Amino acid sequence: MEAGYAEIAAVQFNIAGDNDHKRQGVMEVTISNLFEGTLPAEGGIYDARMGTTDHHYKCITCSHQRKQCMGHPGILQMHAPVLQPLFIAEIRRWLRVICLNCGAPIVDLKRYEHLIRPKRLIEAASSQTEGKQCYVCKAVHPKIIKDSEDYFTFWVDQQGKIDKLYPQIIREIFSRVTYDTVVKLGRSKNSHPEKLVLKAIQIPPISIRPGIRLGIGSGPQSFHDINNVIQYLVRKNLLIPKDLQIVRGQKIPLNIDRNLQTIQQLYYNFLLDSVSTTATQGGTGKRGIVMGARPAPSIMRRLPRKEGRIRKSLLGSQVWSISRSTICGNSDLHLDEVGYPISFARTLQVAETVQHYNINRLMPYFLNGKRQYPGCSRVYKQITQSVHDIEGLKQDFRLEVGDILYRDVVTGDVAFFNRQPSLERSSIGVHRIVVLENPKISTFQMNVSACAWYNADFDGDQMNLWVPWSVMSRVEAELLCSVRNWFISTKSSGPVNGQVQDSTVGSFLLTRTNTPMGKNVMNKLHAMGLFQTTQTDPPCFANYSPTDLLDGKSVVSMLLRQTPINYQRAPTWYSEVYAPYMHYNKQDISTQIRNGELIEGVLDKKAVGAGSSGGIYHLISRRYGPQQALKMIFATQQLALNYVRNAGFTVSTADMLLTPEAHQEVQEIINELLLESEEINNRLLHGDIMPPIGLTTHDFYEKLQLNALKFPDRILKPIMNSINPETNGLFQMVATGAKGSNPNMIHIMAGIGQIEINTQRIQPQFSFGRTLVYYPRFALEAQAYGFICNSYIAGLTSPEFIFGEMNGRFDLINKALSTSSTGYANRKAIFGLQSCIVDYYRRVSIDTRLVQQLYGEDGLDARQLETVRFETIMLSDQELEDKFKYTGIQSPLFEEEFSRLKKDRDKYRQIFLNVENFNFSQLLTDVRQVPVNVASIVKNILLSSASGVLPFDEKTILQKYTMVKTFCKNLPYVFINNIQERLQTPIPVYLKRAASLMRMLIRIELATVKTLNITCEQMSAILDLIRLQYTQSLINYGEAVGILAAQSVSEPLTQYMLDSHHRSVAGGTNKSGIVRPQEIFSAKPVEAEQSSEMLLRLKNPEVETNKTYAQEIANSIELITFERLILQWHLLYETYSSTKKNVMYPDFASDVEWMTDFLENHPLLQPPEDIANWCIRLELNKTTMILKSISLESIINSLRAKHPNTYIMHSVENTASGIPIIIRIYLRESAFRRSTNTRMATDEKIAVNVVDKLLNSTIRGIPGIKNANVVKLMRHRVDAQGKLVRLDNIYAIKTNGTNIFGAMLDDNIDPYTIVSSSIGDTMELYGIEAARQKIISEIRTVMGDKGPNHRHLLMYADLMTRTGQVTSLEKAGLNAREPSNVLLRMALSSPVQVLTDAAVDSAVNPIYGIAAPTLMGSVPRIGTMYSDIIMDEKYITENYKSVDSMIDML
């Protein structure tokens, strides 16, 4: 009878007690000896019943040798119980909540019934139990004291009498606890507290603490250090009497007491890390033992960290053999090929099973052996099941069917190619090997266009390559991991590969119109030569004579006709920046390809460059597949490179030199910048710089200098006037997008400008007031702070060179420091989202818990999208009617059609105008990503059919309209199935919404007025193609979309964090690159956020367009504390007297005059009788008061209202220039306590506290708003004619700090358009759905143009808000979202703590996701493994055919 099998559904964690250890143990350790002679000592810690790691003897338990024996645990019977070191806190909780006399609970269990199970015992133990009387035996519960000197010792304080609780006493107490009490306190029966005190401990198997015996017999031996710990434990245990009985309150001998403590400490060291080599550490009472010069190892030490068992062995994947080398470029190789050195090919072996169909192919390998390539190294003989070295075979050895031949790698084998760090799934791709026969080559070679998959370059990068062994592995590798699958990026939905650098420039030069000297005009033979290396079907040149001339466009069109597409877009070559300085050929300012024919324009980065979304290769991939796109990239690359080799292209120093006139003009521009900088210096010296509120004078001065020293756009004029754009190689590389940018060109030819480090000029850190040794102290000229006047071609002076190196060093250091942070952030994201998998309904769920009702809200794969334009969005009502309303036939159907188009337009506007209003910088646009480009399909159908179609009758037009209407109605059934479509079952609302954008586009592109020249047959073909492409664009079942989202966000976020420190001549942002992402993903509360902002629109439309009024409102909401208005303050101790004509402190003698005037002018504000001798004298900042429109009267009124125990006097507000406004605040006796002997010290403390309260008093504004400035917005609105109008003159208030509720209470603020960057503030006021939207918008705002497809952002937001609260991607957030997935949380971090908590709670871990099945040794249910394959073995057996029968059939 065969044993059945099943998958493990769940794993339960429990605390192991004595019975568990005894049941699992195969023997009892009784002695500490290791060996007796050459064999392990029986009953010793190396007893052969626990396994073997030695080839001299077998395991007694399983009779296996060391390679087959898994090991078996033993037990050590303790003479005295020991506490379980992992659960000391749990032991203390139980001692606090149960009676030490009868074991009954001391607390009222009903008080904790409402809590979740894991929290009950914790809450009960945290309550006050000392002195409580037991409900059962009436005993008074003592105070439980934790020994500060010994981690494992507890004391009880019973009315002043302190007794020690030995483990034996604790065990007796816990034995009286009933299972009912355990369950009511939230613990499982399997976690009974009696298990926390052990009488029998488990000894691990030999296999996890192996020993190495050097020599035979009594030769030297080396054993694992943990064996020494076990030896000590056994020896100390033997020193304890077997019949030792300890009674509570009884004194025991000191030597036994010490031995008990030592045993407990040894058991702790055996399980957990030794904390120190000293007696104690930090007062914790944990003592460590030392083995030689290092702390003793432990069992739990093997779990955590990168080198631990979990991350290194269980989660990590290892291969038998792998090769690694430096990579270099080789454009002769196809993108899916990799050049492999022959020395590597002869070392790395491929296992191939001999079959009838391949024995003749494998025989040459077998005969060559190791002598000649291609050969083999060994053979596995199926009959004998043995492996034979190829060089030791006998002459009569025969290669037979079923044998396995380990042959050399040959051209055509598939191999995995990988570069670390593997931040995206394209970092591991499958290539076809091309063996490089040259023995001098020892590097991997790859096409330069293939680098984008791996984010690699050729500056010394190394990559790994390994070959799958089995046939199944090779087939799976080619189908699942082929680089053609990675051609479209999951992150950006655009193509990853394309032309780079030389081939981009070559494509441009080849396709230009009127190239100088006619370099891209060639005869038939030259054109044929360009196609020699393209590896495509050569075009037909039979129609051309040898004297006919072909231009580059014609040659490229011959290649494009093999994959006919339609393309129209402005090239990168044409730029408005260059237009004033150069002449553009009209035929080169727009690239147009019609049915594979390059009609006009050039091919540059926008058309054929790497990562060009909507480019030529993207269109080819969408229509003909990614494999054809890769072939076209290679073919175009070969054309371009062959042309460049023949025509020539170079960049020389002559391309970088300016003419004398241009150089003079550049110097004039630089001198103007330096002059403006000098004027700012003069303003600083004369005190004329008035900083805005929130900035110091120094900060504002630096900001003015940075703005003044930026190169203006007109610096391009002398550069462009001194070069010839038609022949200048440097300019052509920049203009075509091949390499470089305008700032690079300016740095090389004109000047470098201001060097900035972290958005600041070079600071004087060399010494006090000096930036470098070359400049004097307190120098003010711009050159002393990093302004470089020279260009790279002109050469740099010594200080200029040092300034440039400062910036480079800063970038290097930041990259090194940020790598660890971003790497860990990536790992947390992977673990946080890896359980999110698409099910059969295209929902995203964690096991059975729903995360998204439909993936990405539309169920589409991010790789299957392309950008299209919705024509109706920007049209007014009249324009829409003129363009889309069909009036040829009077029918209510066409009125209905136009009404539907108008509703679609208005719905689109409503949705994305709301998005615009509630985001900082996301404006409405009519461009969206959709799975089907309907206009392209229509154009292709029309171009592929006969032209000159006659107008159709009314019946045909109505029939086409009905077809489109029915198709749009049934489109959501694509998410369900054809059966439901035939039955016309109701469609869920969320599925209708998922298809709404696509239905809008179909109605626009297939409107009646646009399809008059289409037949019904063509319309049917168009609709079928739309449905096919839409179906193919849906996300696959079992897709691990959580990991895809983590990779797609983490990789660009990593780059964003690194790039945030890199500054150019244009300056950069002042936000730290890592702070804001951490705030978002860590779900920090409002008070912990450092960079929260608000955008406030004004309620009154008239005020919204007036900057002055807007600034007044901004001033009114900005939080102004009294401290911000003060220049300086003094706390004085002096006797007040109204008749006194002077004051105690001579420095303030002038105060007497205004104080006298104050008393005369304010007869009702006379000093009170209880005025004290403490006075606070303050000088106000008049500049701040003027800028913030704060009057002295408002300040005084606010202070008097908030501080009634004071008497306030002040000078007049309109003082002369240079004379400050002074306020004196006298404290009253009521503010102090009753007089004591220490009156002076006490009063001083009280006075200081009053000063603190005064300074923090709010004068005006909303709490939380640290700063408020007026900003100009760009927004859209719909006018009366239905036209979408862009408004550029709207002013809003941008704040530093957030308080949505406070802003809503202000009558000037529009409460419906308040935008806050704070996720916590949004959550508190608007709820979880608003917080979800805020997470999406904030990630998009932070990442900007580097942001991934919005589906990945939705994945983040939905996961973080799934529980109804905003949870972080940190460990705490994972615990909240997946509390039952112990294995996943253990794999992330702190495995010992996670396992301990799981055992205490008796947690049950369902096996789902990725980490849990991997740790259990099974394959996760994702991808192609998501669906079970059912095989009909009976059918296969009945229809099995042998090779002979198949040959007979043929």
Swiss-Prot record:
Keyword Transferase attributed: yes
Inducing factors: Expressed in the late phase of the viral replicative cycle.
Broad class of the protein's primary localization: virion
S-S pairs: none
The enzyme's E.C. designation: 2.7.7.6
A Pfam family per the record: RNA_pol_Rpb1_7
UniProt-recorded name of the protein: DNA-directed RNA polymerase RPB1 homolog
Record keywords, A-Z: DNA-directed RNA polymerase, Nucleotidyltransferase, Transcription, Transferase, Viral transcription, Virion
Gene Ontology cellular component annotations, sorted alphabetically: DNA-directed RNA polymerase complex; virion component
Transmembrane segments: none
Species of the source: African swine fever virus (isolate Warthog/Namibia/Wart80/1980)
Domain remarks: Lacks the typical C-terminal domain (CTD).
Xref: SMART domains: RPOLA_N (SM00663)
Family: Belongs to the RNA polymerase beta' chain family.
InterPro entries: DNA-dir_RpoC_beta_prime (IPR045867), RNA_pol_asu (IPR000722), RNA_pol_N (IPR006592), RNA_pol_Rpb1_1 (IPR007080), RNA_pol_Rpb1_3 (IPR007066), RNA_pol_Rpb1_3_sf (IPR042102), RNA_pol_Rpb1_4 (IPR007083), RNA_pol_Rpb1_5 (IPR007081)
Record field: catalytic activity: RNA(n) + a ribonucleoside 5'-triphosphate = RNA(n+1) + diphosphate
Subunit relationships: Part of the viral DNA-directed RNA polymerase that consists of 8 polII-like subunits (RPB1, RPB2, RPB3, RPB5, RPB6, RPB7, RPB9, RPB10), a capping enzyme and a termination factor.
